[in-house]
């Protein structure tokens, strides 16, 4: 598993064919009421699916699942043996889809390239989706006997994944660090962390937790600030729930 191909769909949400999406849903969803409601919401969008809609995220993943299954189950080559028999061999070993980004991993450069071309063709012909032509074929990071890195890390989902460690993508790291440094200043003064800042800290914490960022977390008290941010959000949620309950009682 030394070779990877990475691509992404051009304007994925607006490009989704709603007619095909509905047909896919009709085949697999048997609840008529749920289908009716979902179709009404889909038809409320101007073109394709609406960017930012919570429903669109799920529908986009569902639509792209067809491409995932094609890549995971249909990408084979046939090898003919001397005795006349043929054998199907997988072109790739691993498939990863994350929203409109996808990654194919295999052992042979020619096989991974062929798999990528077949997947691009499938997505265009059967899903009406266009993969950006600048998709990348590269050798995955590996370490020689002297401990030197070669190839490229896998840059996906906000992480840069090396053979022996995982880093947070630089742009995300810098924004996350600013959020925690700012929240830390409020904590040092004994002040409550502003709600929007608390939400940002909670969102960024996942990247730091699931990467090799132990030094950063210790230096900037990330874990302690995260707990303070959680308590801040929890208190606010309780206030809203209590206010909502009072309004219901008043209405009754």
Regions found by a protein language model. Name each.
Residues 44, 69, 76-86, 110-120, ...:
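Right-hand nucleic-acid polymerase module
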Residues 125-129:
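Flexible helix-coil linker/hinge segments at domain or subdomain boundaries
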Residues 1-99, 103-124, 134, 138-139, ...:
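Conserved polymerase palm-domain catalytic core
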